[in-house]
Amino acid sequence: MDLTVPVNAIPFQLLAIIASNVQLKETIQLQPTRDTIEPTLKVNDKVTIIGTASVARYLIRSYNLINETDASSQNVSRWVDIILTQEPTLIQQLVKQQQQTKYLLNDTPQLVDALAWGVLHSAQLPTPHSWAVTEAALILGEEIAAGAATSTQLDTIPQLPGTSPETNVMDVFKNMIATQMNQISGVDTKLLFDALDLPRSLENGDLAIAVPRLRVKGNPAQFAQEWAKQFQPNDHILSAVAIGPFLNFRINAKLLVKKTVDMAAKFGLDYGKNKLDQGKRAIVEFSSPNIAKPFHAGHLRSTIIGAFIRNVYDANGWETIAMNYLGDWGKQYGLLAVGFARHGNEEALQADPIKHLYEVYVKINRDAEADPTIHDEARAYFKKMEEGEEEALSLWRRFRDLSIVKYKEVYARLNIHFDVYSGESQVGDGMERALKQLQECGILEDSDGAKIIDLTKYKLEKAIVQKRDGTTLYLTRDIGAALERYEKYKFDKMIYVVAAQQDLHLKQLFKTLELLKYDFADKVEHINFGMVQGMSTRKGTVVFLEDILDEAKEIMHDVMRKNEVKYNEVVEPEKVADEIGLSGVKIQDNSARRIKNYEFDRNRMFSFEGDTGPYIQYAHARLMSVERKSGLTINPNADVELLTEPEAIEVLRTVAQYPDLVRSLMNGLEPCNVVTFAFKLSHEISACFEALWVRGAAPEIADARLLMYYCARVTLGNAMRLLGLKPLERM
């Protein structure tokens, strides 16, 4: 039997057990390692036991070190359980309290005394002077330490800046390759790490470096040949082979599978996350609808993409603040107030404020086409608002508050939460301070009574910040809002998730912040996106987002009803139908690169065939079904070396790549990369379903396969949550 012992946390209680029995000392081979924190006992090809307590119990029972049938041994068994399950400090207290006898049970040292000593020694806690130190265990500990010291450094997983081998299995292998390649080539370790990529074909290897990426002067193919010859294989990296200018590495598949399963099973919902940017704070401003205008497809894109970005920053250790910056100020609210006096209806306002205010807004704009003086009334009303007249503000407040209540309902349905509801109206004196600073810096110019910033030399046109009547514009309020946010939140990054049509506005804003020499000018970023085309109901009219979502729900509900047996098994089928519909909408929205326009295609969107939202939900629900129908519980200690089939290896390779994906999303923030990953994993899972059954398999194989399916479900579910989907258990 092989006992892998973590060098940095030697379990002396296990060494004490081994030292107490001659047969055990001869049978067990001690293997020092720095790769794990838990001892692992490999009994045979089918049985592996992980964890100090589990290994200790196995050794005690297998070698009859305690006669459990003997009544006098019951007290010994009780002490063994206490020692193996309680905290070392409690064991220390119990030892101190035991004063009737020299040792725990009598005046002669027994196995429980050796165990107790081992626990205390491992925890570096003192033991009573009268106790005999287990010298044989200390000698074994010294042998382990000596063995680790003489073993090659390649057994140690290097900790490289910006990597997380404790949560990302691919970092384990990449760090080892990058470290040794740095010693061979002299190329910077980070450059080597970043150059490591998945090859197009696994026939050539598991990881590859395109030598030209390293920017080394000379012949890339020749370098690849020379470096491959010098590379020393080890337990983790089995070979390095040069193919043209590429250096291909083959990693130990058994270790990859084992480490992947260990991490996915251990971290669960947190699998894939890292803490590399812990302590940093980001504001993500997204959705930001205009009150009195429809919550339409453009807002849907900003909402879905913004929530995704917030999730990505969360997963990479940032503290995030999701902010909804409502369009709740400006001349249009003067127009809305004038319109409400003419066309408003209190009941309709209470029932659905967003729709009713939009109807009022459309009608008053129609009126204004026939009677241009309405615009003068609107401007006068908005001036009263800016001057703080209470009567004007009270009506505006009602519109705003009622609209926010309705928005929150829609966001809850989309599985989206905002930390802050802000708006143009909330900007305080930051706007006035910014205008004053613009004036003092000589940036502000007069233009026919208005105040402008001339940005033409930056190819950003002229930007108006104050109209002739003294009222402000979007840009003015955005400058003031940015200043106030930095003063309040001291963010490390602020992201505006806004459509590409606003590119010029955001460039003008950022350039103005730069000209004002604000400390945070280099901490702002615009994440843009293309348009949704053809987003209308089956009746052909452009409508509110809720109508689109209701239609999606109705379509999916109709599909679900076609299978009466499965439909009757689903709890709350209407909610499930709604979630499948939302998944269809979100996945279609996120399937292409952000900047691309896309055609809203309901026939494709709600299909269970091909790469769609419903297909991903089905893959997750089917994984849940495998767990339910197996009749087994997940065994984290299952022998995954039994997973030798190509289908299983492929699934776990993809699972292993998920933490890398999460980290890489910080560059580009493209949700389509997660969608592609989710489809790839779903297809591989589907192939497994056909080939690798759990029910009917031998117990050890069933355990291993079920653990693999569990890790796949954890990973697929986490990818779905990143995209804002709620993984379904039945459908």
Model-derived segments and spans:
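GST superfamily/GST-like fold recognition
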Residues: 103-125, 132-144
